[in-house]
Amino acid sequence: MDKKEVRQLIMNRRHELSDEDIEMQSGLIIDRLKKSDIYKTSENVFLYMSYNREVDTYMLLSQCFMDGKKVYAPKVLSKTQMEFYCLSDVNDLVSGYMGIMEPSDICDKAKIRDGLFIMPGLAFDYDFHRIGYGGGFYDRYLSEDNTFIKAALAFDLQLLESIPYEEHDLKPDYIITQTQFIRREN
């Protein structure tokens, strides 16, 4: 399968999940993350705002605020540029690029590139390759200097034995599903 076929396969699988399945499985994934040292020791959490039947990151956003973490969310500035901005609460979010919630204009741009970085993706494999939506926003953002711990949140159905990849594709350090917490060995 090529990347386009993998994207379609996973989107079809996610659309077969009921709202209740997404809520339950997302809860298990967030619970697995919040019990981990990578979450407990991170002051800063950079996370995507879920849409299109992704793992529900709004659960994580609420948990981060309860735990006193500094939370940053992405805002698409152009077809090739994305930046992260600090959120003080969920009311800082407004509808943005493709209808995805993003920080409003009152939010301050992140001045750091350090902490726990939650990566989105459609498909992952056990070699930590990742297929996103094809825009390259996260590969570009993460290619700049940073000291992030990169974690991908995914449903088990998004984890495949092998997926097509290119050498420049960035890999997460961890993949967390409702049943697995997988750490990449360097």
Residue ranges of predicted features:
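N-terminal active-site beta-alpha-beta segment that forms phosphate/nucleotide-binding
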Residues: 1-112
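Conserved phosphate- and dinucleotide-binding cores of soluble alpha/beta proteins
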Residues: 80-186
